[in-house]
Curated annotation (Swiss-Prot):
Changing R271K: Localizes to plasma membranes. The gene is DVL3. GO terms for biological process: canonical Wnt signaling pathway; intracellular signal transduction; non-canonical Wnt signaling pathway; positive regulation of DNA-templated transcription; positive regulation of GTPase activity; positive regulation of JNK cascade; positive regulation of neuron projection arborization; positive regulation of transcription by RNA polymerase II. The modification Asymmetric dimethylarginine is found at R271. The keyword Phosphoprotein applies. Interacts (via the PDZ domain) with the C-terminal regions of VANGL1 and VANGL2. Interacts (via the region containing both the PDZ and DEP domains) with LRRFIP2; the DIX domain may inhibit this interaction. Interacts with CYLD, CEP164 and DAB2. Interacts with DCDC2. Interacts with FOXK1 and FOXK2. Interacts with DAAM2. Changing R342K: No effect on subcellular location. It comes from Homo sapiens (Human). It is found in: Cytoplasm. One of its GO terms (molecular function) is beta-catenin binding. Keywords: Cytoplasm, Developmental protein, Dwarfism, Methylation, Phosphoprotein, Ubl conjugation, Wnt signaling pathway. Residues 175-190, 199-212, 565-581 have a biased composition (Low complexity). This is Segment polarity protein dishevelled homolog DVL-3.
């Protein structure tokens, strides 16, 4: 008996399919071909020879018509009939890239009928179909189901459930690669008197193992859902029956892609390992090109290796071995109930997550604000006074990403600042790499895409990649293991933030509070270094006032050690004032020091060019009454703005045109001598001389400013 090969093209797919019929070519009819394919809703076109046009595609609809044969084989094209819906599965066969590849079985998982039941499923046909590609078996199963539904002999009932009533039985796993575990639960699909590890479909061992896999995985997922219900009452009305477990099988062609492109996350608890999950998907890999696997999906099986009873370490080792082998890779994953990974894998970036000392912050708040409001502060901007404050709350709305006009000529720091903002669109979150958590990391390909779409001037994506490489070389972004070459598949974190914190303002620049609006949050210099230049219309030191009726007397700011409560350097070792005992000794040894003050010479080392937050009328008589009242006055007028400029004291001169206010001569004392240090360097004072209510808060504030990413706020 002869054999006929039939090559057929399915719709617009590039790769043809091959079936063999145990009939000679001159006896093969359309009915024989349809009997093998079982596709009644398709139109059949065959390669034939026309006398006028030559080789054409001829449509044949008569089942008894002989099929045209060329060189001992038949070439056919199958086209879906217009308006026909052969299968209710939610995909279209016109687009082969969207077809979920199933397991390579034509009978369907869980089909209760043995393979011998199907007509035209002889030994040769079944063998060749099994060796066919997955898409062939997919469409075969797709067309097989409506035909079964038509005949009355297929309306049998299984455990009291009609076959027609539950078309998304495990047979549906073959056509749409999905299986709803809740439907398995609500139907008596498995024999209750059999062992848990077996099913009634003993004739199909591969399919029953998949059924066991899905049932065990559903049991594990149910335990996790119960724990969530205990933590949150909002899930109390949701039961396991409403949380459908969607399992898909994806076959990836590794010939087109260089890498798989996934990172896996292992979950463990006191009861053991809790499974392998997809942590993130890298762009450019095989998984990203397929598009069906998402972060949060649970990895159940790779090729023929089941991860069910395997530890996380063994699963990682097996996955690495499979990836390095040539050939396609088949992944069986359970879709997560919420496909968005933000809710379950990440922490909010807008709130701090690292612990600090709340008592120190409370005392700092009380000491810095006192009983008076902070002068020059805008009510629309939050101050750094509580544990819930964040760096992002100090950024005015005018500095959001939409207002950044970024181009390739912009400063790199400005571009990185816009990239680091929470509204930038760059996905920055905790990543898992080799079981090491990398906090606030992002993928190199995301950086390139962000630059290409948000920075003007790039002609193509290659230039954006070069710019990202320059960001790495400049230190604005860093590799997790400090590699200097940029790769789109690697994780990166932002560089040192201290340089960018100088751009964050704590005030509205509306001119309502004079020069105090120029205060900015910036890193403080070393105690031995001179302070940076101030942003003022006149340079340091300030010129003497033209009207000075008492040149021999210093101003009130040094009366009886008033600087003891003034702002200090954040290091706690420098102060803008001096203690009383040292001032008294200097008064006896250097009575002419006050004259040098009025001359405007470089000896004014303890003066700054800051405009005073306290006007002349605010200089209460309590300042001249004694040390205690003086310290209280300084603390009460000490605002957050002056604390951030902690290396400066209160100014020497009042507003322009207004003479300084002087007290009685017997209450005056000269300032420290000029030989204490270079111009601009504040004199030294030990931290022990700081009032006790300020010591703890300053230590905490110093630690927070010195380690902004560790203590202050989760910026990135």
């Amino acid at each position: 008996m002869g054999e006929t090969k039939i090559i057929y093209h399915l719709d617009g797919q590039e790769t043809p399919y091959l079936v063999k019929l145990p009939l000679p070519a001159e006896r093969v009819t359309l009915a024989d071909f349809k009997g093998v394919l079982q596709r009644p809703s398709y139109k059949f076109f065959f390669k034939s020879m026309d006398d006028d046009f030559g080789v054409v595609k001829e449509e044949i609809s008569d089942d008894n018509a002989k099929l045209p044969c060329f060189n001992g084989r038949v070439v056919s094209w199958l086209v879906s009939a217009e308006g026909s819906h052969p299968d209710p599965a939610p995909f279209c066969a016109d687009n082969p890239s969207e077809l979920p590849p199933p397991m390579e079985r034509t009978g369907g998982i869980g089909d209760s009928r043995p393979p011998s039941f199907h007509p035209h499923a002889g030994g040769g046909s079944q063998e060749n179909l099994d060796n066919d590609t997955e898409t062939d078996s997919l469409v075969s199963a797709q067309r097989e189901r409506p035909r079964r539904r038509d005949g009355p002999e297929h309306a049998t009932r299984l455990n009291g459930t009609a076959k027609g009533e539950r078309r998304r039985e495990p047979g549906g796993y073959d056509s749409s690669s999905t299986l709803m575990s809740s439907e398995l639960e609500t139907t008596s699909f498995f024999d209750s008197d059999e062992d848990d590890s077996t099913s009634r479909f003993s004739s199909s061992t591969e399919q029953s193992s998949a059924s066991r896999l899905m049932r065990r995985h559903k049991r594990r997922r149910r335990k996790q859902k119960v724990s969530r219900i205990e933590r949150s009452s909002s899930f109390s009305s949701i039961t396991d029956s409403t949380m459908s477990l969607n399992i898909i099988t994806v076959t990836l062609n590794m010939e087109k892609y260089n890498f798989l492109g996934i990172s896996i996350v292992g979950q463990s608890n006191e009861r053991g390992d809790g499974g392998i999950y997809i942590g993130s998907i890298m762009k450019g890999g095989a998984v990203a090109a397929d598009g069906r696997i998402e972060p949060g999906d649970m990895l159940l099986q790779v090729n023929e290796i089941n991860f069910e009873n395997m530890s996380n370490d063994d699963a990682v080792r097996v996955l690495r071995e499979i990836v390095h082998k040539p050939g396609p890779i088949t992944l069986t994953v359970a879709k997560c109930w919420d496909p968005s990974p933000r809710g379950c894998f990440t922490l909010p970036r807008s709130e701090p997550i690292r612990p600090i000392d709340p008592a120190a912050w409370v005392s700092h708040t009380a000491a810095m604000t006192g009983t008076f409001p902070a002068y020059g502060m805008s009510p629309s901007l939050s101050t750094i006074t509580s544990t819930s404050s964040s760096i992002t709350s100090s950024i005015p709305d005018t500095e959001r990403l939409d207002d950044f006009h970024l181009s390739i000529h912009s400063d790199m720091a400005a571009i990185v600042k816009a990239m680091a903002s929470p509204e930038s669109g760059l996905e920055v979150r905790d990543r898992m790499w080799l079981k090491i958590t990398i906090p606030n990391a992002f993928i190199g390909s995301d950086v390139v895409d962000w630059l290409y779409h948000n920075v003007e001037g790039f002609t193509d994506r290659r230039e954006a990649r070069k710019y990202a490489s320059n960001l790495l070389k400049a230190g604005f972004i860093r590799h997790t293991v400090n590699k200097i070459t940029f790769s789109e598949q690697c994780y990166y974190i932002f560089g040192d933030l201290c340089g960018n914190m100088a751009n964050l303002s704590l005030h509205d620049h509306d001119g309502s509070s004079g020069a105090s609006d120029q205060d900015t949050l910036a890193p403080l210099p070393h105690p031995g270094a001179a302070p940076w230049p101030m942003a003022f219309p006149y340079q340091y030191p300030p010129p003497p006032h033209p009207y000075n009726p008492h040149p021999g007397f210093p101003e009130l700011g040094y009366s009886y050690g008033g600087g003891s409560a003034s702002s200090q350097h954040s290091e706690g070792s420098r102060s803008s004032g001096s203690n009383r005992s040292g001032s008294d000794r200097r008064k006896e040894k250097d009575p002419k020091a006050g004259d040098s003050k009025s001359g405007g010479s470089g000896s004014e080392s303890d003066h700054t060019t800051r405009s005073s937050l306290r006007g002349p009328r605010e200089r209460a008589p309590s300042e001249r009454s004694g040390p205690a009242a003086s310290e209280h006055s300084h603390r009460s007028h000490h605002s957050l703005a002056s604390s951030l400029r902690s290396h400066h004291t209160h100014p020497s001169y009042g507003p322009p045109g207004v003479p300084p206010l002087y007290g009685p001569p017997m209450l005056m004392m000269p300032p420290p001598p000029a030989a204490m240090g270079p111009p601009g360097a504040p004199p030294g004072r030990d931290l022990a001389s700081v009032p006790p209510e300020l010591t703890a808060s300053r230590q905490s504030f110093r630690m927070a400013m010195g380690n902004p990413s560790e203590f202050f706020v989760d910026v990135m």
